[in-house]
Regions:
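A conserved beta-strand-to-alpha-helix junction within the catalytic ATP-binding
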Residues: 2-17
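Conserved catalytic submotifs in the C-terminal HATPase_c
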Residues: 4, 24-36, 71
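Short conserved segment of the HATPase_c
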Residues: 84-96
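Short alpha-helical Gxxx[C/S/T] motif in the catalytic ATP-binding
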Residues: 109, 113
Length: 142
């Protein structure tokens, strides 16, 4: 993937505006985070995780997005008030797996997010508690 420097905070803000989700998303992000990664792949990755967070959290809850920069990588957390069962958790990145069979979708979003993260040289993980779920991506910026 060809890298091009862009502002990650701006990219995520744009995704939130496109979904008309400003009232449901709270961003805790530095204003200017320029990263040298593939723009289209990063945009698709963040779109999948934002959409997933909005889709699987209670209707009037707030999705939180936090960007944490360091010298070698950038970490982005997508935090929502939905939960994932302990039985479901190990399978969320499997193709065609859907934890909630009544929700729309084909079970391809999170597996694609995992592939995009790996293509960008990063890591993705998920953790859940009884009150929230956090998807974390860590991407290299060197």
């Amino acid at each position: 993937l060809e890298d091009k420097s862009f502002n990650l905070t701006e990219l995520i803000s744009e995704l939130v505006r496109e979904r008309k989700a400003e009232a449901r998303v709270k961003m805790n992000c530095p204003e200017h985070i320029n990263i040298p990664l593939h723009h289209t792949a990063t945009r698709e990755l963040c779109a999948i995780l934002l959409d997933n967070s909005l889709k699987h959290s209670p209707k009037n809850s707030v999705v939180k997005i936090r960007i944490i920069p360091s010298k070698q990588n950038i970490t982005v957390n997508f935090i929502n008030d939905g939960t994932i069962s302990q039985q479901t958790l190990p399978h969320v990145f499997e193709r065609f797996f859907r934890g909630n069979q009544s929700a729309k979708g084909y079970g391809l979003g999170l597996p694609l997010a995992e592939q995009l993260t790996k293509a960008l040289g990063g890591q993705i993980s998920v953790s859940t508690s009884k009150n929230s779920t956090i998807f974390t991506i860590s991407l290299p910026i060197l």
